[in-house]
């Protein structure tokens, strides 16, 4: 007879620990510096550098550490260990964008649910990718090493504090954190029992090439104001809805649909019910594959049905720094020469039919 006990999480009423929280500071090594090891009482916590208080936290052992797997590394991590009712599990938290800070909100949520949890700044401070220039090891830290080193150190601290390894170890991250989760799975397949890789920003350079392709239009009149998005969306829905054999207000076969935006071009003066010739060109670029000068496809296209979310692509003359930083600092390693999208025109991505 098979019995299952998976209906409720097991909470371990940890009252006695293998060693006191403060003694975890003695676990330093040549590559690990423990900068904080103290018990935080139940209540609210406002981490240094943050203006947002984390409410309703249970008491926990808070450990902060600096990791230096290479001489040029500067990885900051925190590990939070419940003082009581640990559920026996470890949850590592991923970072978004270019990282540069710890995901305290997500750590707090995990702690409230009984997890031992950890997060890292990915080896640098701040949302920019400027840390990459002249520091190839820091780029490796950001890509995957910081997350791995954090996980190894977190498990070491868990073992020292509770006297046992976690029963299960999980990863949770979205966007950049999803990308990190996929890399941890491929490089360190035994590190986690489960990985939540939400909306992973994978092959990011290829997808972000579209951002630059749109920005090669220097004429401000090429940018489509958000007030026109509903009109464009209605036209796309009309053209694509029935491609799956059923007209039901849903686009379920976007791969079968190619919209001719010239049909929306203004016959006379500009208005909210039409596109200028330059705006037509922008719409065509957004919904066409982006390729190199040799014809290699970098990004297939933005699919029909996404028009109401075009603001990041068609809403201004400069791409967000998040995307521009990939080319400014990582590809070209030239923060001055590639400071504006227009200066990338020496080898711009192009649109293919």
Give each language-model segment a name.
Residues 17-89, 93, 102-105, 233, ...:
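Catalytic-loop region of hydrolases
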Residues 1-7, 199:
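Bacterial N-terminal signal peptides that target proteins for export
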């Amino acid at each position: 007879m098979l019995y299952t006990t998976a209906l409720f999480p097991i909470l371990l009423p940890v009252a006695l620990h293998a060693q006191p929280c403060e003694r975890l500071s003695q676990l330093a090594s040549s590559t690990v510096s423990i900068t904080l090891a103290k018990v935080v009482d139940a209540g609210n916590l406002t981490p240094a550098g943050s203006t947002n208080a984390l409410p309703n936290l249970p008491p926990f052992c808070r450990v902060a550490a600096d990791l230096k797997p290479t001489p040029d590394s500067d990885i900051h991590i925190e590990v939070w260990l419940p003082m009581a009712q640990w559920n026996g599990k470890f949850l590592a938290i991923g970072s978004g964008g270019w990282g540069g800070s710890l995901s305290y909100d997500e750590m707090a949520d995990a702690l409230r649910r009984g997890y031992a949890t950890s997060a890292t700044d990915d080896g640098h401070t701040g949302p920019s990718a400027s840390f990459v220039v002249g520091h190839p090891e820091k780029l490796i830290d950001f890509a995957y090493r910081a997350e791995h080193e954090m996980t190894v150190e977190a498990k070491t601290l868990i073992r020292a504090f509770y006297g046992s390894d976690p029963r299960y170890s999980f990863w949770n991250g979205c966007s950049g954190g999803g990308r990190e989760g996929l890399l941890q799975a491929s490089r360190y397949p035994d590190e986690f029992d489960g990985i939540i890789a939400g909306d992973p920003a994978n092959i990011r350079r290829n997808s972000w090439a579209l951002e630059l392709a749109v920005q090669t239009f220097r004429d401000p009149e090429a940018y489509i104001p958000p007030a026109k998005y509903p009109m464009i969306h209605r036209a796309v829905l009309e053209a694509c809805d029935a491609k799956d054999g059923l007209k039901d207000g849903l686009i379920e076969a976007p791969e079968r649909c190619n919209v001719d935006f010239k049909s929306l071009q203004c016959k006379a003066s500009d208005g909210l019910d039409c596109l200028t010739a330059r705006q037509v060109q922008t719409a065509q670029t957004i919904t066409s594959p982006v390729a190199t000068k040799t014809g290699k496809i970098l990004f297939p296209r933005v699919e029909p049905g996404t028009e109401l979310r075009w603001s990041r692509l068609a809403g201004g003359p400069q791409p967000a720094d998040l995307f521009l930083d990939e080319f400014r600092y990582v590809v070209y390693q030239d923060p001055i020469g590639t400071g504006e999208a227009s200066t990338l025109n020496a080898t711009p991505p192009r649109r293919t039919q």
